[in-house]
Amino acid sequence: MAQSNSYKILVFGLPGSGKTTFAKKLAKDLPYFNNDDVRRMFNDWDFSMHGRIRQAERMYCLANMTHDHAVVDFICPYDQHRHDYDVKVWMNTIKEGRYNDTNQMFEKPSHCTFEVKDYKYDHIIEEIKKKL
């Protein structure tokens, strides 16, 4: 778990669910890590199970390096990699993403702080910001 005086916020869901839009609104003045940007920075485009696990660990490590609040935005298909985040926002706005392999491996969360089912989510962003 992150330091008690900082929140690590995970925005996760299928491709096309609105993760990046939500995360950018939330992270206006916060450190923000987008999956595609991080993959580009590390030149790591491995989407196998092992590649996705490596990316999940990398995203959490980057968020923790800030020693402050941070927002992380990525698919995070495996439930086990979501537990370390303080706030978990599931973008459950679509039933299927663009990629069949991702749809098949994506595990519904055992727990999330917020479940976003439509694009009227400004109240959720405000609620999270109040905690910071």
Question: Which residues does each predicted region cover?
Answer:
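Phosphate-binding P-loop
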Residues: 1-6
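Hydrophobic anchor at the beta1->P-loop junction of P-loop NTPases
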Residues: 11
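P-loop (Walker A) phosphate-binding loop of NTP-binding proteins
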Residues: 14
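ATP-binding Walker
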Residues: 17
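Walker A/P-loop
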Residues: 20
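Conserved substrate/cofactor phosphate-moiety recognition/catalytic segment
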Residues: 23-64
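Glycine-rich phosphate-binding loop used to anchor ATP phosphates in small-molecule kinases
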Residues: 49-97
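Small-molecule kinase domains that catalyze NTP-dependent phosphoryl transfer to phosphate-bearing small molecules
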Residues: 84, 91-132
